Structure formats: C-alpha cells, structure tokens
Amino acid sequence: MKPFNIFDSNSSIQGKFFLEASAGTGKTFTIEQIVLRALIEGSLTHVEHALAITFTNASTNELKVRIKDNLAQTLRELKAVLNSQPASLPTYLDINCNVKQIYMQVRNALATLDQMSLFTIHGFCNFVLEQYFPKTRLIHKNPALTHSQLVLHHITNYLKQDLWKNVLFQEQFHLLAVRYNVTSKHTSSLVDKLLASYTQPISSYFSSRVERLEQISLWHQQIYNSLLEIPKQVFLDQLTAHISGFKKQPFSILDDLHHFVDLLYTSETHSSLFSFFKIAETFNFKHRLARYKPCAAFTVLENMSWVERTLEFCNLDRIFNTLLVDLQEYLKQNYTPWLSPDESVFALEKLLSSSEAQPVVQALREQYQLVLIDEFQDTDKQQWSIFSNLFISPKFTGSLFLIGDPKQSIYEWRSADLPTYLTAKSSFSEDKQLQLVNNYRSTPKLMEAINQIFGKISPFLEIPGYLPIEYHALNPQSSETFENPPHAPIHFFFYETIKDQALWIFSEALRLQKEQKIPLGNMVVLVSDSNQAFELISYATIPVSFSKNKSIFHLTETHILTTALLEAILHPENYEKISKILFSSLFGLSLDEVTTKKEDFTIYFQSLHSYISHHGLLATFYRVMTTQGNVLFSSPRGDLIFQEMEKLCGYLDTISSYPYHQLLHLKNFSETGRWEEELAISSYSEDLETLKITTIHSSKGLEYDIVFCPGIEKSKKNKSSSELLREMYVACTRAKKQLYLPISTQPPSLQRSSALTNYVKLEGTQSSAYDLAIHLHQEHPDLFSYSLPKDHGHATTVLNLPLLETFALKVTPPKTIFSFSSTKFLLDTHKDSQSIPYSKLPISKQQLPLGEKTGILIHKILESIQFSLLQDTEYLMSTIMRFIKHTHLEGFEETILKLLSKTFFSPLTFSSQTFSLSQVLPNKIFRETSFLFLENQELWQGVIDLFFEHEGKYYIIDWKTSFLGETNSDYSKSNLSIYIKQEKLDYQGRIYVKAVRKFLNQFEIDDDVELGVIFIRGIDTQGNGFFALNSSEDIPNFNPKAIQKCQAYH
C-alpha cells in the first residue's frame, strides 16, 4: 500500500481510495483536511455535496466540530495573508493561487456547514428512505407522542381488534391471558411484554392457523375411526382409572376428561382437542409411577401422539412468539417497517438493488462529489452492498475514501466482519490502496516498543481466502518525550493474586501522580469487562471511577432503584411501593424492620413527596443520600450506582419539572434509549483527580498518558485468536507515554486463554508471557522492563485527605399519619365489659385454624382470584393450593373452597339493593386499594380489601376471618353487631367510607358509599356472616394526638 500524506500535493484526493489508518495516525485530522483540500482544489464545490459516515452519533458530532474548527482556523490564516500578515497555509497550495477566491470558498463552507451530510450508517439509510422512498417510512406519526407511546398505541389497537384470531386459536390466547394476568402482582401484562419484545427477532413460532386447523382435522378423522371399536363410556372409564398410574398433580382433571372425550366422539372437529394441558401434563411420561399399567384407551391416544401434540399446542413461548410475529407485521404495515435500526439497512439494500431504484441511485451519485466512510472495518455485508452499489460504480464520478483499520475491528458481536472489509479492499487497484504511516500519539520510544511487539506477529491477521494482513511499523512523529525511571516505555509487572495486581496498579498510579505530575484523570486501567473492573475497584486505595459508554441500564440496578424511589415518593400511602425501595440496596432493611416501622417510613416518604414538588428530583435524591449514602456505598457497586443515579436524576429534571412526568419517562427510558442515543447516559468521568477504569471496547478512539492493561490478562471464552490479538492491539495503542502490562506468576498450565497468552502462542518463540517479558527486556532494555512481585511491597498507602465538605438540608417537620390500627388502642379502652372473648371459644378440627397466618393466607387468596373465573372450580382449587402448599392450611383445601364459594355466591343485602359478588363486573373492581387523605389537618391511611361499582352504586367490602363459633347461626346479624361494636369495626368503616368519598369527589361523584363486612367462616345464603354498616352512624369522640406513638398495622 502507498503512503498517504494529505499535505503532499503528489498525493491526489480525486478518485476512489481505500485508506488504512492505524491507531494514532491522525485519521480524524486527515478526514477534516480532505474536506478542506477538496474545497480549496475545487473538486468539492459546496459542502452540501460532501457526505461523511461514521460509526456513532458521538463520532459524527466530533467530526463536525473538527471540520468546523479546521475551516475557521484556515479562514483566519487566509485572512492574515490577505492582510499581508504572517500565516501558515497548507503546503499543497499553489504559490500563485487566488487567495481571495479560496477565502470566499472557505468562508461560504463554514457558514453553510450544517448543510453537509454527516450521518451514522443508520442515519444515512433513514435519510435516503425518507427522501426517496417516503411510502416506506412512518405511515402514522403523532409529534405529541414518543416512539414508544406510538408503538404502545398500535399494540393496544391490535389487541382491541382481536387480530390475534388470525394466528392463534381462542384456547391458546386464553393461556396467554392467564399467564400475563394484569391483576397479578407477580407478572407483567401482555401489553407490557409485547412492548418490551417487539423488536426481537423470532425463530420459533407456529405455522399458519389454517394449516394447523387442517392438521387437527386430519388427526381427528384418523383417531375417530379408531374410536368406533371402543364405547364412549368405556373409553372415559379407562382414562379415569388410568390416572392412578401417574404422579398426583395439584389439580383435578375429571371434568376435563369428560369434556375431552365428548369432543373426541363428536364427528365435528374442534381446535380445543389439543387444549387440555392438564390432562396432557398428568399423563406425561415423566410422571409415570412403578404401578403404571397400559390401557386400550390411552394406547389409542399414545399412538396418535396426543400428549406431545397437546404440549406443543399449549407451549406458551411458541404461542407468544406467534402472536409477536403477527404483531410485528401489523406494526410494519400500520406504523413503520423499521422496528429496529438495522431493519432500515436491510430495507435500503433491498430497495437499491431493484430496477425501480435506479433513478434514486443516480440522484445520490449526482448529489455527492466527496464521500468519506469512516470506521470501515466495522462494516457488514449489507452496509458494503449499499456503498458499493452507490459509489464504487464508475458511474459515480466523485471522490470516495473508505477509511478503516482491520487491526481495530473488535466489534464482531455487532455483525462487523473482516471478510467484508477485505472484499471491499480487493475491489481497489493497488495504486488506490493507501495507508497513513506516521504516528502522532505515542512518544517515539513507546511507538518503537509497540512496533517491536506487533511486528513479531507475521502475518498479523490471516483470513482464509484473502491475502494476509501484515503489521506495518509506524513512524513516530510526536515531539514529546517521557522518562520514567526505573521503567522503560513498556513495563511488565508480575503479580500473584488479583489483589496484588490491583495494589501494584494503584500504587504506581499514585507514584506517577506525585513524581511525574501526571493527573490521575489522564491515566486509565483497561479491563475486559465490568466484573473485572468491580473486582479491581474493591481493592482501590486511591479515587477511581468506572467509565463506560453504555446505557445506565446495562450493568447496574440504577434504573430499578431510581424508579422504585420515585414511585415510593409519589405514592407514600402504598405499602407495596414503599416496601420495594426499603428492601433494596438503597435502604437494605429486613422484613421485620419494614413491618415494625412501616408507619414511620410512610411519614418519611410523605415528607419527600412535599419536598420533591418544591425542589426537584436531584435535590430530593441528595436529601435521601444524607441518611442512606452509607448504606448504598457499603453495597456492591454502590459508588457507581450513586454516580449513575445522580446523573439520571439530573437528566430527568431537564426533561420535566413534574415528578409524575419524570416517572412516566423513566419507565419507558430503557426501551426508548435503544432509539435515541442522546438518552444514553455515560458515566465517563472528567475528574482529573480520579483514576479511570474502562473496558477495552469503550476505550477505542480514546488516548491517555498512562495505560494499565489488566484486560489483556483476563481469560476469554468464545473469542477467536484473531479477535484476541486485535483487542490487545487496541489496548496497547491507547497509550501516549507509558504502557503497563501485567503477567501472572501462575504456571502456564494453570493459565486460561487470554489476549496475552494468545499473543505468546502466535509469537511462537517463547513458552510463556514470563519468558517473553524477560526476552524483550534482554533484547531491548531501553524499550522494555519488568518487575517481580517482591519489587513492590504490600504496604498500604495512607492518604491524608482533607475532610469532605458536607451540607445539610432543612428538615421538613413530618406529619403524623393515623390509621384505624393506630387509633384502635384508645378505642379499645371504651370496650363494653360484657364483651365476648371470642379467641377463647373452642374450635373443632374441621374448622380453619385460628391465628394471624390463616387470615393473611385467606386474604392473599381472595386478592389473587379472578372474578371472571369464579365459576371454574378447578381454577379456584389450583389458586388455593398455590398459596397454602407447605403451610399450616395444607389439608384444608376443600374447606377453603366451600367458604370461598359461599363468599362469592351468597346474596349480600345492602340498603340500596341485594346481589352477590359473582354478579359484579370484573372491570369495575379495585382490590387492595391504598389510601391517604387529609382530614382536619390530620393524615389518615389504610388499605381497602374490595371497592367496586355495581349498577351505578358504590360499595366497600372488608374481609374478616374472625372466629365467632362453630355454626353459621353464631354469625347472625345480632352477634355480628355486638362483635363489630366490640372491635370498633364501625369506626374502621367510617374511615374507609370517607376515603372512598374523597376519591369519588375527584370525579365530581357525590353518590353514597356503602360498606359491608363479610365474615368468611360464617357466611351463607340465609344472611348470616354478612353485616352492612350504617353509614350515618356517628364517629366516637377521641383525641388522635394522644396516641401518636401507636404503630399502624394492616
């Protein structure tokens, strides 16, 4: 390849060139000079005819700034010449050139630089599609909505129209609906799951619904003929008896068996033949017992693979994938074909290869006179197809530069591949293959050492089917020198343990800071991944920060913690949201601590609720950190999480001043971050007093005075020898003055494959990295040095750091929050002396056990039951078993089922009407509803078991598992009245009714609210076990301030 020098007038820039730019050779400088030279020489008449494509948005912005600064500097020099002042102009300028004309050309370019086409590859593809193929772009776009909100809108529309029926059977969709049950606290909704997954590629899904229905019909016809020999009742009896040969399941299949056999013996085919998952799971081969005996009925099913077909039919992953594929097609047709950025690349490649695109191809060729494609080593086949189609053709008369370095191709996981790079290179003649040969980054001695290391590998890279890639030594051009006795420019240090390695690095960094006056911020520790970074940080003796260019959602729980904190602040009355953040690493509390201090924390978050509305999210975060900072910093990665939460809170404050808007944005952040690069928050530290730690991949394109490379010693899995060598090259070429390479003292047989051990193997003359270091030092003592573990002590450096400046935030006086639980103590002092001690009543073994645990479990069951499935006995039983398995209630399943059936189907008589809970519409029900309201300057909180609307009236239900006696008559209205007054439940009811009325008033609803108490142990169809409270009853007089120290329990 020919050397290329932009300032050499003999190095032409007109034509098509393949330019290799090794690390530190001034690639970006060369690109900006190519643009300037093209303007000066006239091959580029206007900057709007220039196209530059880079890898990331950050690179695009940097290049634009560099080009702008270069044009501005050149303009100043030209102006100086016009004013007959000393000036420095490019050497390729002809001495007799028209300086005034060039001045006007550069000034015009600077003023109109925004018209230059500067894109990432995805940006370029989107630009072409929008300009020339508008029909393939967004079909519907509402500027008031974000991309995520638009996708959510279309997902909702898809489901509302029941379009799933085109690809799924009703039984399959029912399985999905149960799996993604929105009333469950443990699962996400189907809509949320689809929103989180809509960009994912899908490989495993069902064939078309029509095809599957044909297969079901054919299957049924075949088995129907076999069934003619077995009477229906005999078939059913055999299958029923067959159950005993399998392991017992936590559900009954008797009703399903009757239904299944009915369908089998019907001549008409039903898709639900394969929907009996419980039968298939019961008769699964893996559940067979030793006493299993075959039967004729099951043999028929077995021969027709019914169990296998049913398990496949009910496979939730395939059902979801099938739905997702159809949804993706719907989004492409109704919103945008480009569900992910890469799809725009695929689409443009396909469109440009069609005959109808030739006018577009011609228009693009005519639009651009200069095309610069940077980081070409990271290009894939589709991208190269686009570029070659547009600009390699002789019909493109402008200039083209493909610029890259195969030695720095470390993004194979992003689809970049070297064969594509080499294919592109081979399409250029040898005289058009250029290279930058001068290094401006590293000191001459360090560059000489780097040349020595990589010059030993020949060929540097070898790809089957292509000419080998050689390492070409670079000419050092830096005028800077650096002396660092006793170390040579590349220093190998040996270590025994990771702790030894970390302490050596931190000790050496501190020495360089003191003796060489190099700020810690100009040094970097390059690691393989975040785990290695955090391990090193755990031994840090100096200030360090892990700098990464990833989204904050990539490694830590920052997103989760920030969301949980904001939800707790905005909903201080919601115990579940408060508990979530209290259990997290931000507070680190135990279950007992949260339970006993729940009211205190509600008061605390209520004070933060007021604070955030006046001071913003970031200030509120700092306020929380004044008490919780030590807890967070003592947790793994706590310092990094603090930095990220700080940055995220500050970012959200710039988005909106309304906390609820911030929470909405935060919940959609992780998904939208994939589309909007400006939303990705980098934790890259600019602090000069902090040693940086970053990954080798993140360091690409950056440079540092001092580089420590423990990342090349970390074992790597599933990486090719070629990629390991390229990673080592990238790591070593980040250094400007000094490079440190660690070597483990473990025997080679115990060392796993790493970039360094891979290098030793490729170099071939030494048996270990240890031997290599010794050999290099003996061969070039002025370039390489080494130190053994004994050369440094393990003395811990004691830093005399100044005391941290702290600040205190004004504490807002908290309000006491009252509840029925906290006031009950005082109310109990008014109890009637004739009250009945129900807790001492005898209880038979047939009754549910007494105690708080029983009440909690029954409440959990009632909380989770879907009202739409109350008629489904098997569903109710499976729900009950799910909660009571391995508890003290195991064995009471039938008793609980009977009690629940009575609870939901017994008539409840209120003053306005009589009805059962089974008649209430599921979509008009709120369960476990938390409230917090202000009454007479006092805050009241609580949780309502059930709140619903029925036929235009509003009702509250409170569940009670209190034991009043063995018979239903013990739960008569007269007995309940005594118990309710005794336990002050009428007082509790008044609090709940007040809370609901305040809630309804927000919607200008002034209707009355009635409250009923259901005693689950005694409810029946005769009116026992239910008591409707009189809402007009007066509240007993009391002074809540007298009981402020009482805790609230629910």
Swiss-Prot record:
Residues 1-443 form the UvrD-like helicase ATP-binding domain. Binds 1 Mg(2+) ion per subunit. Residues 814-1050 are annotated as: Nuclease activity, interacts with RecD and RecA. The keyword Cytoplasm does not apply. Residues 1-766 are annotated as: DNA-binding and helicase activity, interacts with RecC. Heterotrimer of RecB, RecC and RecD. All subunits contribute to DNA-binding. Interacts with RecA. NCBIfam families: recB (TIGR00609). In the RecBCD complex, RecB has a slow 3'-5' helicase, an exonuclease activity and loads RecA onto ssDNA, RecD has a fast 5'-3' helicase activity, while RecC stimulates the ATPase and processivity of the RecB helicase and contributes to recognition of the Chi site. This is RecBCD enzyme subunit RecB. It comes from Chlamydia pneumoniae. The gene is recB.
